[in-house]
Regions:
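Fold-level recognition of mixed alpha/beta catalytic cores in primary-metabolism enzymes, strongest
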Residues: 134-225, 233, 237
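Single conserved hydrophobic/aromatic residue that forms the stacking wall/gate
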Residues: 1-8, 13
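Acidic-enriched catalytic cores of C-N bond-cleaving enzymes acting on peptides and small amides
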Residues: 195-199, 218-248, 268-342
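A short beta-alpha structural unit
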Residues: 18, 250-252, 262-263, 296-308, ...
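Active-site metal-coordination/substrate-binding segment of hydrolases
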Residues: 62-163, 189, 198-199, 311-315, ...
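A non-catalytic alpha/beta surface segment that caps or lines the substrate-entry region
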Residues: 22-66, 423
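Zn-dependent metallopeptidase/amidohydrolase metal-coordination segment
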Residues: 9, 333, 340-353, 360, ...
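His/Asp/Glu-rich mid-to-C-terminal helical/loop segments that flank catalytic regions of hydrolases
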Residues: 222-239, 268-270, 315-322, 330, ...
Length: 479
């Protein structure tokens, strides 16, 4: 059964949970894929970035069929509770054994990495099974998708010869993705002057938020802990003189931040700061009722012997946190449920005199993406800072005459007696990179049911994973 492959065998998710593989640290998991190819006598290609392509010849009777590319990424987002001591660079991901009985694979207090470990499990299972009917296959394992699609961008696609590509980096069974937004990372940075402060020092903590994926979850209206921190600092500043000692919120720009801390020097006393935090907690819970019900703002005393940003630099930092937009910027005029453009400040950091805001910009329109990037750059220049852009990737345009999508719909209907949904999504997929490099490539993206990806509540439905695997085998048989 695929359940065995997913959870208990050589090719399972558990295997890859034993190999640390957060973004930018994928050498070991690339080696795992390379060794798999060697052990199975399969031709492979590995580039300097760490991308791996494994080739498998067609099964009997499929030698003259068009080649199919199977594709997924091997890096994962590392998210954990703030109190966790888990080190994603060396510690394994521990699967919650009790959750298996309820039908889900999840990890203990960390992200699971089913995004996109499930694609790796599928591809290795297919490559390992010589009983499957399939055309020539090219299994593409890319690195650093979660930090700007860097692996796909670096891959020399001249090593690929497929006509069709099946990307397995989607998170809802029965929903076939046929297009996606483009994206860009933008880091606003500002150097500050720090000196000793004699005022009381407090830690302002924003927690209890759901967080989520800055693409697929941004349309829910979930708040960002980084944005809320800016609101809290502004409220305190209205009643007292404050200076910022440090800020920390979020680890990656493509996740909605669910926890943030601000350490401030302040002329107000603890009781006043604590009262303001309680007031804002009540206000925010009312504002986000039904969206994020457990928001909590709390204050704690901290070491008074600290250096803090100057008053002017503190004002400039708060200005950056308050004035740039957050969340959905625009929606599709014909489909209000479809987000077209968004902005997410996933990373907030102030330490050693340097302030940084890391943004994920997404849009279906290159011009709108550029407009937001320019606004961030303008703000950086206004406060005397600088801006660095990276990870610019194109949108994936919907192909109206896709044979692959038509075939996938037919197979799904035959197997489950209902039609799938076809959608264009706001999240960025590597499909856009491949579509740009290989314009004739016919692409579809799908995957099993996953929930709360990019958070430590991430979980994968085992039953759904089984069905999607069976569907993939049947689709390969038909191509």
């Amino acid at each position: 059964e695929i359940t065995t492959r997913l959870v208990g065998s050589e090719m399972c998710i558990r295997d890859r949970c034993n190999i640390p593989h957060v973004s930018h640290h994928t050498e070991a998991i690339s080696g795992y894929c390379e060794n798999f190819a060697k052990e199975h006598g399969l031709r492979y290609y590995r580039d300097v970035a760490g991308n791996v392509v494994i080739y498998k010849k067609a099964s009997a009777g499929y030698e003259n069929h068009d080649t199919v590319i199977l594709q997924g990424h091997i890096d994962m987002v590392g998210a954990k509770p703030n109190a966790s001591g888990h080190d994603f660079l060396k510690d394994i991901i521990n699967i919650d054994e009790d959750a298996l009985e309820s039908g889900y694979i999840t990890a203990v207090d960390t992200t699971l990495g089913a995004d996109n470990g499930i694609a790796v499990a599928y591809m290795l299972a297919i490559l390992d099974d010589d009983t499957i009917a399939h055309p020539p296959l090219e299994a593409v394992f890319t690195v650093d998708e979660e930090v700007g699609l860097l692996g796909a961008s670096a891959l020399d696609t001249s090593v690929l010869h497929g006509r069709y590509m099946i990307n397995m980096d989607s998170e809802e069974e029965g929903v076939f993705i046929t297009g996606c937004a483009g994206g860009l990372r933008s880091d606003l940075m500002m150097d500050t002057v720090m000196d000793k402060t004699e005022n009381a020092v407090f830690r302002i903590i924003t927690k209890g938020l759901k967080g989520g994926h800055s693409g697929s979850d941004i349309g829910t209206g979930r708040p960002s802990a980084n944005v809320i921190t800016g609101r809290v600092l502004e409220r305190i500043r209205q009643t007292a003189d404050i200076r910022i000692v440090s800020l920390k919120g979020g680890a990656v720009d493509n996740a909605i931040c669910n926890y943030a801390e601000a350490v401030i020097s302040c002329t107000a006393d603890y009781d006043r700061i604590s009262e303001l935090c309680a007031i804002m907690t009540r206000e925010l819970r009312e504002e986000y009722a039904g969206i994020d019900d457990d928001i909590l703002i709390e204050a704690k005393t901290a070491d008074n012997h600290a250096e803090a940003a100057s008053e002017g630099d503190t004002d400039r930092i708060i200005l950056c946190l308050r004035q740039l937009p957050y969340g959905v910027i625009s929606r599709n005029a014909c489909n209000i449920n479809m987000v077209e453009t968004s902005l997410n400040p996933g990373v907030m950091l102030y330490e050693n005199g340097v302030f940084r805001l890391g943004y994920s910009i997404r849009s279906s329109h290159a011009s709108a993406k550029r407009e937001l990037a320019d606004r961030i750059r303008n703000m950086a220049e206004y406060v005397g800072g600088r801006c660095e852009e990276s990870g610019d990737y194109p949108s994936w345009p919907h192909r109206h005459n896709s044979l692959l999508c038509r075939m996938a719909g037919q197979v799904y209907n035959e197997m489950y007696h209902k039609d799938p949904a076809f959608e264009i999504i706001h999240a960025g997929l590597e499909c856009g990179i491949f579509a740009g490099k290989m314009p004739e490539l016919d692409i579809i993206s799908y995957g099993p049911d996953m929930y709360d990806v990019h958070t430590y509540d991430e979980r994968l439905s085992i039953r759904s994973a089984e069905r999607v695997y069976d569907f993939t085998l049947k689709l390969l048989e038909k191509l």
